[in-house]
């Protein structure tokens, strides 16, 4: 019999004993995701994050998260015209258990884009970088399709190259006009009903009739320096109330002295 130490027994543990499995969800907390006040439904969902432990702060782990929500969910309706439009919201600050988000972009669903593309027509696309009055640099993509005239006997409705260039120029002009003179809040309010695309369709009717004109995508390329006051205003929680309601300054004559109390 060989004489020697048993390494397994010297460590005080038994062979084959598994470690106790800890559920990772016990170390996490739920936070409510809040959309800006431009949308009807403010509570859009919940998100998980590890609790604050040591130098790892929970709120810092939440900042910068991007949430993609359908416009139908944000507006709390079942309208099919809203369901294919997706808005991206980015977490900028945490107040208690609420994650305050800001607009981070917009896109269309893939099935909607595939449905719009058809044969015997011309697809016209345009994109331009524009800056809002409050310092957000946006890249806006627009798409449109030529429409067949009801009186035409042709099978196709192709536009000429000069007409395509004129339509693209008109798209860029209208997008620049509507975005550069507006703040981000006003731009989002225009994207919800897609009023910019409707203006483009009306303006281009004289060049060539269009159909299914829409703002296909919006990217936020650059944003101004973060300010908590502007974010709170975006969520409808800015300092709109009157100042000094709780402690107004009382008017007293000069040389006023408070009366001496007889007992305390």
UniProtKB/Swiss-Prot annotation:
The keyword Protein biosynthesis does not apply. Pfam families: Ribosomal_S3Ae. GO terms for biological process: translation. The lineage of its organism: Eukaryota, Metazoa, Ecdysozoa, Arthropoda, Hexapoda. This is Small ribosomal subunit protein eS1. Residues 236-264 are annotated as: Disordered. Residues 236-255 have a biased composition (Basic and acidic residues). It comes from Spodoptera frugiperda. GO terms for molecular function: structural constituent of ribosome. Its main location: cytoplasm. Keywords: Cytoplasm, Ribonucleoprotein, Ribosomal protein. Belongs to the eukaryotic ribosomal protein eS1 family. It is found in: Cytoplasm. It comes from the Eukaryota. One of its GO terms (cellular component) is cytosolic small ribosomal subunit.
